[in-house]
């Protein structure tokens, strides 16, 4: 106790901050702030390289910090606002690894001058200012600090131990993504439409979260997860105040992970956003949202499991069915992958509904496998191009296996992983979640999941047949040669997908060792 505190017993004590436990997030947010300063003070010609080195270096340093923290005791830090436990470290490490892959795609500018991002975000589509910016060779580098802020929010979201911290994290990860979604160079109006839709629906989602937070506080007199759980055990669990509050918070979380019926933004945003940003959102945001969902429902509202489990069952079934059936009708490869991500969210929810330790670890493993196959798949989408940008219509992919066997083969590998076929990580990911769901008493969900997997396998295999079993068009698309950074991102996805398909046990053991969540 300081002399001032001893002399003033009514003084507010200074908070004790465990900087070692917070170091990974501090590094990421520090790099994001440094990136803003780079935009202000570094000459334009040097910004791209500076931002790339700064961002990649920061992500690697943060990942090293996460690994170094694995030996620390599990405890609540930052005045109990953040849980420094096994799931936090596992999810943060996954987010950082996926962010490195996504940032490699964002930084790669080898396919034409700024083929993915508009030269100046403020330029109107088709305007003279936009043409002048392109002719001047201007490069959009604000994406780096924006992406780093989003990564920081993704890391904080599943680590939050109270609803206010979770809401702050939700906004920190969401606001940069609203901007990044509108920065596509090609199809500018579609990109800006995607950004507006994402922003408006995201604002409604945030409003639901805040309203639910207020109701939960009115019931529990606290926003800390542990205090909420204690209040549930000490009073009437069926109180309408807590039920409505939980429902509103659940809606906000299901929106972020594209659960039905809160999924309608996903195809439009995935299609309109720059493809590297789509990969970043599809992988990183879903991992962070599921991590937050696990902590909120298992730690804070575990006492209401009998109330929310039937709802999760219904959402999981609807999510798998909608993602599988509507995916069949898609002719745009990015929209197809969007519905694929919706179906995958349903598969993860089957294990989540089991509410067992095995379900927690299986969800963590699935998120790792899904994230890397998604990054790799969108990286391949960037390479298949027409004169006006990416060739996203499936008719343009006909015969791709004969034009570029390597690119088509790698894309086929990622599709097989999404279908859950050997020898890929997708097989063991689905085995893990379906086994956990069955053992947890969610057998009907497993049946629906297997049937939905068969339907999704159809549209994955349909693309493979298009690429390898049909003759290419005379004037087909070109396949760009990826630069070193994009090649590294693709290689990362391939390596993780294949290695986890052959030797999944080390990561399964790591996920099992990470759980349970600190309560």
UniProtKB/Swiss-Prot annotation:
Keyword Chaperone: no
GO cellular-component term (any): plasma membrane
Membrane topology type: Multi-pass membrane protein
Swiss-Prot/TrEMBL keywords: Cell membrane, Membrane, NAD, Quinone, Translocase, Transmembrane, Transmembrane helix, Transport
Coarse class of the protein's main subcellular location: membrane
Biological process annotations from GO: ATP synthesis coupled electron transport
Annotated transmembrane regions: 22-42, 53-73, 87-107, 141-161, 163-183, 198-218, 242-262, 287-307, 310-330, 336-356, 363-383, 406-426, 442-461, 483-503
EC number: 7.1.1.-
UniProt GO molecular function: NADH dehydrogenase (ubiquinone) activity; NADH:ubiquinone reductase (non-electrogenic) activity; quinone binding
Compartments where located: Cell membrane
PANTHER family with a match to the protein in the record: NADH DEHYDROGENASE (PTHR22773)
Family named by the database record: Belongs to the complex I subunit 2 family.
Function: NDH-1 shuttles electrons from NADH, via FMN and iron-sulfur (Fe-S) centers, to quinones in the respiratory chain. The immediate electron acceptor for the enzyme in this species is believed to be a menaquinone. Couples the redox reaction to proton translocation (for every two electrons transferred, four hydrogen ions are translocated across the cytoplasmic membrane), and thus conserves the redox energy in a proton gradient.
UniProt name for this protein: NADH-quinone oxidoreductase subunit N
Organism name: Acidothermus cellulolyticus (strain ATCC 43068 / DSM 8971 / 11B)
Lineage: Bacteria, Bacillati, Actinomycetota, Actinomycetes, Acidothermales
């Amino acid at each position: 106790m300081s002399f001032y505190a001893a002399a003033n017993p009514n003084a507010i004590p200074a908070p004790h901050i465990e900087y070692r436990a917070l170091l990974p997030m501090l590094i990421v947010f520090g790099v994001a702030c440094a990136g803003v300063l780079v935009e202000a003070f570094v000459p334009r010609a040097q910004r791209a390289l500076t931002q790339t080195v700064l961002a990649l270096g920061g992500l690697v340093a943060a990942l090293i910090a996460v690994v170094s923290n694995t030996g620390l005791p599990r405890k609540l830090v930052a005045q109990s606002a953040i849980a420094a436990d096994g799931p936090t470290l596992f999810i943060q490490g996954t987010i950082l690894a996926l962010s490195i892959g996504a940032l490699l795609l964002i930084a790669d500018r080898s396919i034409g001058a700024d083929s993915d991002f508009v030269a100046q975000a403020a330029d109107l589509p088709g305007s003279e200012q936009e043409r002048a910016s392109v002719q001047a060779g201007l490069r959009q580098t604000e994406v780096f600090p924006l992406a780093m802020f989003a990564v920081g929010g993704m890391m904080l979201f599943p680590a939050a131990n109270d609803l206010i911290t979770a809401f702050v994290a939700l906004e920190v990860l969401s606001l940069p993504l609203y901007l990044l979604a509108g920065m596509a160079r090609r199809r500018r109006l579609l990109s800006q439409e995607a950004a507006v839709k994402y922003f408006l629906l995201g604002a409604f989602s945030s409003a639901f979260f805040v309203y639910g937070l207020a109701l939960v506080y009115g019931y529990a007199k606290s926003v800390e997860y542990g205090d909420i759980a204690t209040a549930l055990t000490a009073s009437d669990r069926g109180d309408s105040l807590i039920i409505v509050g939980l429902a509103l918070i659940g809606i906000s979380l299901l929106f972020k992970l594209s659960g039905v019926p809160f999924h309608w933004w996903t195809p439009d945003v995935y299609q309109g956003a720059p493809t590297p940003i789509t990969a970043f959102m599809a992988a990183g945001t879903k991992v962070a949202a599921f991590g937050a969902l696990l902590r909120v429902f298992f730690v804070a509202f575990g006492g209401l499991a009998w109330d929310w489990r039937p709802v999760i069952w219904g959402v999981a079934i609807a999510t798998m069915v909608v993602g599988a059936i509507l995916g069949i009708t898609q002719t745009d490869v990015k929209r197809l992958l969007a519905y694929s991500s919706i179906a995958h969210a349903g598969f993860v929810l089957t294990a989540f509904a089991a509410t067992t330790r095995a379900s927690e670890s299986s969800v963590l493993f699935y998120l790792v496998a899904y994230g890397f196959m998604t990054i790799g798949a969108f990286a391949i989408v960037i390479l298949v191009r027409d004169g006006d940008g990416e060739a996203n219509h499936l008719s343009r992919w006909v015969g791709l296996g004969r034009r570029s066997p390597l690119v088509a083969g790698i894309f086929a590998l990622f599709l097989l992983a999404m279908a859950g076929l050997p020898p890929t990580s997708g097989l063991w990911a689905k085995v893990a979640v379906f086994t956990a769901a069955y053992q947890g008493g969610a057998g009907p969900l497993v049946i629906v999941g297997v049937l939905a997997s068969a339907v999704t396998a159809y549209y994955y295999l349909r693309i493979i047949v298009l690429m390898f079993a049909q003759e290419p068009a005379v004037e087909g698309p070109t396949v760009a040669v990826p630069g070193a950074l994009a090649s590294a991102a693709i290689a990362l996805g391939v390596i993780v997908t294949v290695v986890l398909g052959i030797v999944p046990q080390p990561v399964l053991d790591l996920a099992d060792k990470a759980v349970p969540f600190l309560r």
